[in-house]
C-alpha cells in the first residue's frame, strides 16, 4: 500500500471506528462483532505504526492510552479558573440575589435569569479545542496553572477528540468536571480490595488519582466520565449567555449535565435546590450541592470578579453527610474470597437521615494509617448508598483507654491459616472449608442480581450452614421440604415458596450463573460479555487466557482470574453438581455455519407475526447478527407496518427489504 492509499485508509478506519464506538457505548446498538471491531482497530494501529506521520490527531487509538510520561508539565489557563463563593442556607441565596440586583441597579421586583446545575463532586479540568481538534487538556491546579493531562483525558469516551461540526470555532476552551459514577466506583473499589490494593475513600479521590496517572493506559481502564459547564477563551463563535453555551456544545458532542436548567429568579433557584436534594440519592453520581450562575454573559461582565471568585456565581452546598460517633468495637469480617476486613461497630448515629451503626475500615494498613482504635471518637461519612466510612479520628478526645485491633494470626471464624500476599494489603484466610467464606459465597449466589432466589437471606443461609444442610452453592438444590420444616416459624406454604424459588433459579440466564459463581474480578457486565462470547459454561471453562483476552473489555488480570477459577478441582466439582441438580442456564447457542452466518438483519416497523426479540433470536440461532440501525453492511431489512426512516435508508443504500412473510420463508 502506498502512502496516499494508507492516508485514505487511516482516515476511513478512524471515522468508522469512532462511529462504531458511538453505536456501542452511546446507543447500545452495535453493528459488528467484537472480533470485527478488533480487526479494524488492529489494522489502524498497524498503519499508524508504519506511517506515524499520517496518524490523525483525533485517532481512536489515542483512547487506549499512550506512552507513560516522566512527569506532568505545567499549563497556564487561558483565563483563570476561579473558585466559587459558598452558600449554606436559603438566606445566603436570597442575599446573593439581592446583591446581584444592587450591583446591576435592578428593582426588587425584577427577576434575574439563573442557570442552575448539580455541583459535581469530581475534578475540574479545562479542554482546549483548536479548529475543532482537542489540543490540550489540563487540571485546574491553583486556578492559574494546572497540569497537562491531555493523553489521560483522551481516554475518556465522553470527550470528543474532534468537535462534531462542519464549522468549528478557531478556539474553544471548555471547563468541565471529571467524575467516576457510583456503580463503577463500587466495582472498582471491590476489585482493588480483592487484589489486595487499598480502596479509594470516595469517587472524587478515585477520579483524581486516575487523572494523575503518568501512564495513560491505566487511566484508560477506569470508567471516567465528564460533564462540561462553562466556557473559557473562545474565538470564532459568540455565545450570548450561559444557557446559549450549554445548549450549543452538546450538538458538538460535548456532554452537559441534562439536569442543568435556566430558572426565573430566586424562587426558581430555591425550587431547583429542593428538587436536587430529593433526587440526590437516586443519581448515578455524587453531587454535593447546586451551582447558581447569572445567565446572561453581559450581566456577568458587569458584575465582574473578586480576587478569588466571580461575583455572578455561587455554590449552594448540601448539608454535610458526616456525623461524630464512638467506635464501640472493631470486628474482623471474612468475605467470600477470604479477605478479612476490619469493620467498626459504632454507637448508632444519624447521618443525613440514615442510622449508621457500622463502617468498613477496609484493611489493616488503612486502619493503622488512620490510627483507628476501639473507643475512639470518629467522624463518619456516608456518600449516597456507598458503605459508610470512618474519615477522621478526633485524637484530642482520647482518654487513654483506646485499644488497637492487631492483624489476625489465624482466621477469626475457622481458625485456618492467614496469609498476606506480597504486594497486597489484604489479609486472607486460605482455609478451603471456612464457613464465613461459604456464607458470603452462598449469599452472593442467591442475591437478586445473581440467581435471585427469593427468601434465601443471610440469617437463613447461616442456619443452613450451621446445621450442615448445605456446604456450598450446589447443595441449595438438594434441599427438601423436610429440611425446611426443621426451622421455627417455617410453615408448609413458606417451604413450598422457597422450593419454587430455588427451582425457578435453575433456568436463569447464563450470565447470571457466571456472575453468581463469584469469580474474582467478574462483575455483571463482564459476565454478560463472557456469556455472549462463549455461549455455555463448558466453553467458558475450557477457554484459554488468550481466548479470554480476545474479548473486548477483558484484560489479562481478569482473564487470569477466570482461568484460575476453572483450574480449581473444587470449583469444577461444584459446577458438576449444579448440572446434576438440573441447573440449566438459558443459552441460545449460535449455529456455526448457519444459513445467516455473517449476515446482518435490521427489523423495523410494527411486527405482527413475531416480536423483535423472537426475530433476533431466530437470526442469532442461524449465526447471523441483528443490528439496530441500517448501514452499508446491512444485508436485510425486515419491514413491518408503518416502517419509517430505516426503510427509507435501506432503499437509498440498495439493501434488500423483506416482508415478515419473506423473512419466515427465508427461515424455512
Curated annotation (Swiss-Prot):
Residues 591-668 form the BRCT domain. GO terms for molecular function: DNA binding; DNA ligase (NAD+) activity; metal ion binding. GO terms for biological process: DNA repair; DNA replication. Keywords: DNA damage, DNA repair, DNA replication, Ligase, Magnesium, Manganese, Metal-binding, NAD, Zinc. Pfam families: BRCT, DNA_ligase_aden, DNA_ligase_OB, DNA_ligase_ZBD, HHH_2, HHH_5, Nlig-Ia. GO terms for cellular component: cytosol. NAD(+) binds at residues 34-38, 83-84, 117, 140, 177, 293, 317. Zn(2+) binds at residues 411, 414, 429, 434. PROSITE patterns: BRCT, DNA_LIGASE_N1, DNA_LIGASE_N2. PANTHER family: CHROMOSOME TRANSMISSION FIDELITY FACTOR 18, DNA LIGASE. InterPro entries: BRCT_dom (IPR001357), BRCT_dom_sf (IPR036420), DisA/LigA_HHH (IPR041663), DNA_ligase (IPR001679), DNA_ligase_AS (IPR018239), DNA_ligase_CS (IPR033136), DNAligase_adenylation (IPR013839), DNAligase_N (IPR013840). DNA ligase that catalyzes the formation of phosphodiester linkages between 5'-phosphoryl and 3'-hydroxyl groups in double-stranded DNA using NAD as a coenzyme and as the energy source for the reaction. It is essential for DNA replication and repair of damaged DNA. It is an enzyme of class 6 (ligase). Its cofactor is Mg(2+); Mn(2+). It comes from Citrifermentans bemidjiense (strain ATCC BAA-1014 / DSM 16622 / JCM 12645 / Bem). It catalyses: NAD(+) + (deoxyribonucleotide)n-3'-hydroxyl + 5'-phospho-(deoxyribonucleotide)m = (deoxyribonucleotide)n+m + AMP + beta-nicotinamide D-nucleotide. Belongs to the NAD-dependent DNA ligase family. LigA subfamily. The active site is at 119 (n6-amp-lysine intermediate). Disulfide bonds: none annotated. This is DNA ligase. The keyword Transferase does not apply. The keyword Ligase applies. Its EC number is 6.5.1.2.
Amino acid at each position: 500500500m502506498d502512502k496516499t492509499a494508507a492516508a485514505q485508509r487511516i482516515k476511513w478506519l478512524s471515522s468508522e471506528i469512532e462511529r462504531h464506538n458511538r453505536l456501542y457505548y452511546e446507543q447500545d446498538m452495535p453493528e459488528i462483532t467484537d472480533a470485527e471491531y478488533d480487526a479494524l482497530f488492529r489494522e489502524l494501529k498497524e498503519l499508524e505504526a508504519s506511517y506515524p506521520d499520517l496518524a490523525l490527531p483525533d485517532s481512536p487509538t489515542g483512547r487506549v492510552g499512550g506512552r507513560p510520561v516522566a512527569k506532568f508539565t505545567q499549563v497556564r489557563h487561558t483565563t483563570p479558573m476561579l473558585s466559587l463563593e459558598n452558600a449554606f442556607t436559603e438566606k445566603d441565596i436570597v442575599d446573593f440575589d439581592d446583591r446581584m440586583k444592587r450591583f446591576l441597579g435592578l428593582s426588587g421586583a425584577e427577576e434575574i435569569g439563573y442557570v442552575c446545575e448539580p455541583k459535581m463532586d469530581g475534578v475540574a479540568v479545562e479542554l482546549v479545542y483548536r479548529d475543532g481538534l482537542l489540543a490540550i487538556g489540563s487540571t485546574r491546579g491553583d486556578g492559574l496553572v494546572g497540569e497537562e493531562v491531555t493523553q489521560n483525558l483522551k481516554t475518556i469516551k465522553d470527550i470528543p477528540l474532534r468537535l462534531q461540526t462542519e464549522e468549528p470555532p478557531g478556539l474553544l476552551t471548555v471547563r468541565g468536571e471529571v467524575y467516576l459514577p457510583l456503580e463503577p466506583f463500587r466495582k472498582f473499589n471491590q476489585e482493588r480490595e480483592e487484589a489486595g490494593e487499598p480502596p479509594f475513600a470516595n469517587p472524587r479521590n478515585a477520579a483524581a488519582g486516575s487523572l494523575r496517572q503518568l501512564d495513560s493506559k491505566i487511566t484508560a481502564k477506569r470508567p471516567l466520565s465528564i460533564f462540561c459547564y462553562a466556557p473559557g477563551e473562545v474565538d470564532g463563535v459568540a455565545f450570548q449567555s450561559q444557557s446559549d453555551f450549554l445548549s450549543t456544545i452538546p450538538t458538538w458532542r460535548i456532554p452537559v449535565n441534562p439536569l442543568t436548567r435556566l430558572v426565573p429568579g430566586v424562587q426558581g433557584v430555591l425550587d431547583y435546590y429542593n428538587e436536587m436534594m430529593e433526587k440526590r440519592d437516586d443519581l448515578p453520581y455524587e453531587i454535593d450541592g447546586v451551582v447558581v450562575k447569572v445567565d446572561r454573559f453581559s450581566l456577568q461582565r458587569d458584575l465582574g470578579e473578586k480576587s478569588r471568585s466571580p461575583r455572578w456565581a455561587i455554590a449552594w452546598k448540601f448539608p454535610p453527610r458526616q456525623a461524630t460517633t464512638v467506635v464501640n468495637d472493631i470486628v474482623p469480617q471474612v468475605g467470600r474470597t477470604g479477605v478479612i476486613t476490619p469493620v467498626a461497630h459504632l454507637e448508632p448515629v444519624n447521618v443525613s437521615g440514615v442510622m449508621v451503626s457500622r463502617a468498613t475500615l477496609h484493611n489493616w494498613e488503612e486502619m493503622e494509617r488512620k490510627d483507628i482504635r476501639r473507643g475512639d471518637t470518629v467522624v463518619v461519612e456516608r456518600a449516597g448508598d456507598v458503605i459508610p466510612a470512618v474519615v477522621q479520628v478526633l485524637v484530642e478526645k482520647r482518654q487513654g483507654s483506646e485499644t488497637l485491633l492487631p492483624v489476625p494470626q489465624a482466621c477469626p471464624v475457622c481458625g485456618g491459616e492467614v496469609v498476606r500476599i506480597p504486594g497486597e494489603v489484604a489479609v486472607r484466610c486460605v482455609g478451603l472449608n471456612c464457613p464465613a467464606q461459604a456464607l458470603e459465597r452462598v449469599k452472593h449466589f442467591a442475591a437478586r442480581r445473581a440467581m435471585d432466589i427469593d427468601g434465601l437471606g443471610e440469617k437463613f443461609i447461616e442456619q443452613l450452614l450451621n446445621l450442615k444442610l448445605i456446604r456450598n452453592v450446589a447443595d441449595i438444590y438438594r434441599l427438601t421440604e423436610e429440611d425446611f420444616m426443621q426451622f421455627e416459624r417455617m410453615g408448609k406454604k413458606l417451604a413450598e415458596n422457597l422450593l419454587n424459588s430455588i427451582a425457578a433459579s435453575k433456568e436463569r440466564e447464563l450470565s447470571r450463573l457466571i456472575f453468581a459463581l463469584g469469580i474474582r474480578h467478574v462483575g455483571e457486565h463482564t459476565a454478560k460479555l463472557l456469556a455472549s462470547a462463549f455461549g455455555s459454561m463448558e466453553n467458558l471453562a475450557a477457554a484459554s487466557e488468550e481466548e479470554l483476552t480476545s474479548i473486548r473489555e477483558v484484560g489479562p488480570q481478569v482473564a487470569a482470574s477466570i482461568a484460575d477459577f476453572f483450574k480449581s478441582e473444587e470449583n469444577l466439582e461444584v459446577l458438576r453438581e449444579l448440572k446434576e441438580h438440573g441447573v440449566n442456564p438459558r443459552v441460545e447457542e449460535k449455529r456455526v455455519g448457519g444459513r445467516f452466518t455473517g449476515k446482518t438483519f435490521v427489523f423495523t416497523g410494527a411486527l405482527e407475526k413475531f416480536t423483535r426479540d423472537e426475530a433476533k433470536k431466530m437470526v442469532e440461532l442461524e449465526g447471523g447478527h441483528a443490528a439496530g440501525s441500517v448501514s452499508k453492511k446491512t444485508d436485510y431489512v425486515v419491514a413491518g407496518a408503518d416502517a419509517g426512516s430505516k426503510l427509507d435508508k435501506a432503499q437509498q443504500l440498495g439493501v434488500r427489504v423483506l416482508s415478515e412473510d419473506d423473512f419466515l420463508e427465508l427461515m424455512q
